[in-house]
């Protein structure tokens, strides 16, 4: 199996460029190999109706792809008048993942919107979105602290995500599109920096997988996510 010079346990080249857009409180271009996602964090001084008057905040996410982010053009979902099931699933996953590491009571009655827009897709767009959105969220929270709008940091720890799978009978880390398309098993792991799991998604595309294979994929995912935490920290230190 060819991985463009990568070992089975290697991430693709990872880049996180902060302040990629000037207007949002947080804006990051995250690159997992040829997958590129712009993640922005925008603060609004309001909360959803179910939280009004409760003194607590909210973190939510939206996800989309440019029409030609993939090999062939896809119509904009706005033109179709509805979001696809895949889009809804991914943006809910992003929102859940970031809420898992946020203390909403420290946000006050405000919402942070995480917008993840895929400008080029080559596998792992949801995992790249979660990983980049965390960095954007840190910048947005930092802006609130500097402005004196909040007095304590609501972020409890970091969160990141990576894909793993079984390709040609072998456990591999951080699948690109070609690998994902031929994978016998495809899994996504979302974890916090304390080593806890936020979400595990796994599907056998062909033969069912064994407990041993799942353990091998989990081990790879944990190794990869720990590396992603380092990339996040390095980006935030620049």
UniProtKB/Swiss-Prot annotation:
GO molecular function, one term: tRNA nucleotidyltransferase activity
Reactions performed catalytically: tRNA(n+1) + phosphate = tRNA(n) + a ribonucleoside 5'-diphosphate
Binding residues for phosphate: 86, 124-126
GO biological process, any: rRNA processing
Enzyme Commission code: 2.7.7.56
Enzyme class: transferase
Keywords noted in UniProt: Nucleotidyltransferase, RNA-binding, rRNA processing, Transferase, tRNA processing, tRNA-binding
Family label: Belongs to the RNase PH family.
Purpose: Phosphorolytic 3'-5' exoribonuclease that plays an important role in tRNA 3'-end maturation. Removes nucleotide residues following the 3'-CCA terminus of tRNAs; can also add nucleotides to the ends of RNA molecules by using nucleoside diphosphates as substrates, but this may not be physiologically important. Probably plays a role in initiation of 16S rRNA degradation (leading to ribosome degradation) during starvation.
HAMAP family in the record: RNase_PH (MF_00564)
Subunit structure: Homohexameric ring arranged as a trimer of dimers.
Protein name per UniProt: Ribonuclease PH
Annotated source species: Trichlorobacter lovleyi (strain ATCC BAA-1151 / DSM 17278 / SZ)
